Amino acid sequence: MPSEPKKKLDDTETQGAHAQAAHALGPDEALLHGQYRIQSYLSSGGFGVTYLAHDSLDRPIVIKECFPVLTCHRRGRSVIGRTREDAATFSTIVRNLMHEARRMARLNHPNIVGVHQVFEENGTAYMALDFIDGLDLLEIIQNDPRRLTPKVVQSILKKVLKAVAYMHDSNMLHRDISPDNILITADDEPVLIDFGAAREVTNKASKTLSSLDSVKEGY
């Protein structure tokens, strides 16, 4: 479930983002006994909320929170199931996500986002990920296509394919490869993010969510 170590947001964007994600934790919230402190909301999807944070050494970190909106809601800081049945489903999602995230943490590849830590708090699961200072490939395609010269595109494709092959050799599937899940650094280095582990687990855990594709449509 890692997702989305996106570019930093300015103060105006951050305020707007928080207004759009009322279920997100607020700025300056501490996690793991103060080891991580949230700076701002970055993004959210059907299965998680992503934050920019800093660790105890004041280094930028991305925090991904397991938050499947169809099965849970926030009460204070705690994340709980909407119904008794949802609570059982959510518990299964968290348990399996922790397992998948620990497997991801063993991956070590320059073109795959690094997992620093996996932990449980507030009744849900969290992943601490590398902060990648860059734009996702979809943003570049839409807003700066001239940057994608044939040479750059060829380099990106080769490196992404090598990263995918490395994952397959490690008996793992990404399941959600698309331009918005490939970050591009200032040096045109691609980094795979957002592994969609919770999506795979949810499909197994709940008939309610079984209509959701475990592999992104079109990719």
What are these regions (language model features)?
Residues 156-157:
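Activation segment signature within eukaryotic-like protein kinase domains
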Residues 77-106:
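AlphaC helix of the eukaryotic protein kinase fold
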